[in-house]
Amino acid sequence: MTRHALRSTAILILAAVATATGTAAAQDRDFAAPPAKPVKLVFIHHSTGEGWLADWGGRLGAALKAKKYFVSDTNYGWGPDGIGDRTDTGHWWLWFRGPKRTTYLNALYKEYEQHCDYTRLAADPGGENTIVMFKSCFPNSHIGGKPNDPPKTGANPLRGQDCGSAYMKVANVKGIYKDLLVYFKSRPDKMFILISSPPLVKGATDAAHAANARAVHNWLVKDWLKGYPHKNVAVFDFYNVLTSNGGNRNKNDVGQTAGNHHRFRNGIIQHIQTVASNYCAYGASGDDSHPTAAGGKKASAEFASLINVWYNAWQASLQKR
């Protein structure tokens, strides 16, 4: 893609976002304010999420503390049946649609502990977790199939499978995420934030699989929630955010106009791509896709700019019910 084409694409994306949200820009500015009192949030993750939360890494824990969110988390080995071990795309069906979902989610909503080290609010405000964040790790960005394959309907062979499954294909991945909306729709009293799977470094994937990952994550942001009736689901494009940097893996491009971003800026939600890359720009090494602290800090800044907008929009929608 040429530089001119990239610039045009970015303008079109911004125009689309502005069209969707521009009439509510003033309202969105109001929605950017922190909650009046602390809100409980639980984050389902593994090693990349741990690094993102950590003070030595992306400092997401500290960023959410500053926004008045009381953060707990799950990690390897957590919960009934050790369900915390299973966080690949196909596993989300087990958590939110499978026969033991009530057991898993009752434990999740009541979780209040830390399962890795990060800064958080000192006082637990009590009650169940209000927000559930969930994220699969970077191997889930190695996706087969074709970029424009539609979501699989009906029985999906990826249900309950790990990311090494032969069924890890675009249609099945999209189908899993569509399946989750059935549960989310049944719980308008909870908020669910999907963190898209982070990108792989170039040495850990190939162009076709990386392009499929880009297509899936664009679909999640633009199409997944079309027609969904509530405001209790959001998606943060962690993948896109980690595909551009400020010159090297230890320097980020947070706050820059150009680059690949998902953030709240100038009164609107921006999801833009001006850098033609489908690979991790912050890999710890040429074959290690764990993001550096610089990448994590960029993601923290951009996510922290969005969460209040999503949360307040959801709360406002509940008042209208």
Question: Where is each model-derived feature located?
Answer:
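Substrate-gating cap/lid alpha-helix
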Residues: P199-N250, G255-A258
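Histidine-centered active-site loop/cap adjacent to the catalytic His
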Residues: N260-R321
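Bacterial N-terminal signal peptides that target proteins for export
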Residues: M1-A10
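Loop/turn elements at helix/coil->beta-strand transitions in domains of secreted/extracellular proteins
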Residues: K37-K40, K67-S72, G127-V132, S186-I193, ...
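N-terminal module-boundary/linker segments of secreted carbohydrate-active enzymes
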Residues: Q27-V71, N308-R321
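Conserved SGNH/GDSL esterase-like catalytic core that processes O-acyl groups on lipids
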Residues: G49-Y167
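Active-site-proximal beta-strand/loop segments in catalytic clefts of secreted hydrolases
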Residues: I44-S47, T74-P80, F134-P139, I195-L200, ...
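Bacterial N-terminal signal peptides
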Residues: T9-A20
